[in-house]
Amino acid sequence: LRSRGLGDVYKRQLPYLESIRQLKWELGKNALCVHLTYVPYLAAAGELKTKPTQHSVKELQSVGIQPDILVLRAEHPLSDGLRKKVAQFCNVDDKAVVQSIDAETIYEVPILMQAQGLDSTILEKMGLPIGETPGLGPWRKFLERRHAAETKEPINIALVGKYDLQDAYKSIREALSQAGTYNDRKVEVHFVNSEKLTDENVGEALKGMAGVMIGPG
């Protein structure tokens, strides 16, 4: 659940919130509610604001849902004092407040989450045995390989599609990026609007491309 819009589209969300409440009631400790919220940074004041998170949790509590874990999405690191404040006012354990700050790539997020003990906290709350901390060796090797690939000469790939919103093709872009990692090359994806392509300009539009991919739609 995201804190953004919880009150704005409250009526539309009620059926989903009620389903979560009932599921948590039926499964008890066999279910966890992990609430992802955004902690905005006010540049003028130079501080992070936790009020939106507090209000969001209170909205959930008002419909019978108590988050077990809070993941705070922020652009800057949260101090221990700020995290403790969130834990106190949102009625969760200190160690159940995890920050998710901006990372160089999304693939670093699991490493950052593990470093804060999120995996152990989940296992503990669900009454599951906590073994040795996994080293995540294959994942770390992938990250090392990805960083190394970023230093190589790029391969240019044209992604032809009709949607201007780049996120519409995010899965394709990520797939191409991962393919580049496993081939030790940096892949640069260039979006080409299919509706603006003509017989006259297609040659220039695709000039210098090592490959062309046609997006769905």
Regions found by a protein language model. Name each.
Residues 49-50, 163-180:
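Glycine- and acidic-residue-enriched helix-capping/strand-helix junction motifs
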Residues 150-155, 186:
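A short, charged/proline- and glycine-enriched loop
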Residues 153-163:
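Short beta-strand segments enriched in small/hydrophobic residues
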Residues 173, 177-217:
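Flexible gly/pro-rich beta->alpha loop and the following alpha-helix that scaffold active-site loops
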Residues 12-13, 17-21:
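His/Asp/Glu-rich metal-coordinating catalytic cores
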Residues 1-10:
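Single conserved hydrophobic/aromatic residue that forms the stacking wall/gate
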Residues 24, 31-130, 139-147:
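Internal gly/pro-rich beta-alpha loop/helix module
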